[in-house]
């Protein structure tokens, strides 16, 4: 239902945000 969709969207957003934060604060070898 709608609640599950919202839950999944929130989960995806949290995962993306966590990934962005990790990328920001992790040294990136170039």
UniProtKB/Swiss-Prot annotation:
Give Gene Ontology CC terms: extracellular region
Q: Where in the cell is it found?
A: Secreted
Task: Supply the alphabetized keyword list.
Answer: Amphibian defense peptide, Antibiotic, Antimicrobial, Secreted
- Give a brief account of the tissues where this protein occurs: Expressed by the skin glands.
What pairs make up the disulfide bonds? none
Q: What is its main location?
A: secreted
Q: Which GO BP terms apply?
A: defense response to bacterium
Record's function text:
Probably has antibacterial activity.
State the protein's name.
Answer: Nattererin-1
